[in-house]
Amino acid sequence: MPSPRLLVIEGNSPQTMAEHVSFGGVPASTGYSDLLRELLPGAAVDICHPADPGAVLPDGQSLQGYDGIAITGSSLHIYNGGAAVTRQIDLVREALTTGTPLFGSCWGLQIITVAAGGVVRKNPNGREIGFGRGIRLTAAGRQHPMYVGKLDVFNAPTVHLDEVETLPPGATVLALSLIHI
């Protein structure tokens, strides 16, 4: 089997990435890329920064050329709008037409939701920070390969304020908590 070609879409603005670096961290896309290369030795991993004005895919690449796409978290909020948000929605909307598998974490889930026709809002229950507690797999989640070996109820590190209010047509919920989908 040939090595996979993967795309990581950085959800943060250049300012947020610079702030992470100034505190000794790395941009989310760097962390994702490093982890993917560790889990899949030999994988080719590209990074795209659609929050940046003028950002493009690496030379010679198209979304159809990837075996998978991962979208990071972000400090942005979809309901605040703006060019950085719109560019990401447009890119993901295009990615959805390719049939390439997409994985979205937090912001990534929100961008995929909106690009596919769903609605995201600020959670009326407030921010969840630290650990999401009591995350429950649905029947579909228990059958999904991503959750093989996972407990039916688990905790996971989390920081988010927003939630999916309305699922896009055809979406399937794999897991949820009492606070957020």
Task: Give the positions of each predicted feature.
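Conserved small/polar residues in nucleotide/adenosyl-binding loops
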Residues: I179-I181
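N-terminal beta1-alpha1 cap of cysteine-dependent amidohydrolase-like domains
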Residues: M1-R87, E94-T98
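Conserved beta-strand segments of alpha/beta enzyme cores
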Residues: A44-D46, V119, N155, T172
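Conserved binding/recognition cores within well-folded domains
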Residues: P168
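Short, glycine-/aromatic-enriched active-site segment of Class I SAM-dependent methyltransferases
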Residues: R142-G149
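Anionic-ligand binding region
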Residues: L161, A171
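Cysteine-nucleophile active-site neighborhood
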Residues: S74-G141
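Short gly/ser/thr-rich secondary-structure transition/capping motifs
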Residues: I47-V56, L137, A156, A175
